[in-house]
Design a protein with these regions (language model features):
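Conserved N-terminal phosphate-binding loop of PLP-dependent enzymes in the Aspartate aminotransferase
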Residues: 1-175
């Protein structure tokens, strides 16, 4: 229906759609519209966050976001190292003040075991430099596939270790 829009929620890379980046110009246009209409820009980093794209969050990559900072970032999956955990980050004092201790920001957030798993996971990612490693290994993977000359591979795309290979022929059976 008609009326004010509260928020725009987007993934910077459409993972389930085949690892399709939105593009920095699209994200900048969305930010502009959100600002004009006083709507929040929320970036869903459930699949792209916690280092998978070669940055802690995909929105931190200039090539994906055009330098846009969202109002809210949501994240899960990677932060718990296999244990269900989710969270959100809000930017700006006014918005952050709305989320006080005890506020419900995620189904799996706020439990002691999940928080411990997240702290341990983040510690390993940082100590072992896994964010930079994802960027380097992803580039190595994409360059290797692109240069192998196999006619089965039409294209390869991605950021960090979130990648897709487009095949020349559909594959109808499980890999």
């Amino acid at each position: 229906g008609k009326g004010p829009v509260a928020a725009v929620i987007m993934e910077l890379i459409q993972g389930e759609a085949g690892v399709m980046p939105l593009g920095a110009d699209y994200v900048k246009a969305a930010r502009k519209l959100c600002d004009e209409h006083k709507a929040l820009l929320i970036i869903d980093e459930v699949q792209t966050g916690i280092g998978r794209t070669g940055a802690w969050f995909a929105f931190q990559r200039e090539d994906l976001s055009g330098g846009v900072t969202p109002d809210i970032v949501t994240f899960a999956k990677g932060v718990g190292g296999g244990f269900p955990m989710g969270g959100m980050i809000s930017f700006g004092a006014e918005l952050s003040a709305l989320f006080t201790p005890g506020s419900h920001g995620s189904t799996f957030a706020g439990n002691p075991l999940g928080a411990s798993a997240a702290l341990a996971t983040l510690g390993v990612i940082e100590e072992d430099n896994l964010v930079d490693n994802a960027e380097e290994r992803g580039k190595q993977l994409r360059d290797g596939i692109a240069s192998c000359g196999n006619p089965l591979f039409v294209s390869v795309r991605g950021r960090g270790l979130l990648d897709a290979i487009e095949l020349a022929h559909p594959c109808s059976h499980a890999a």
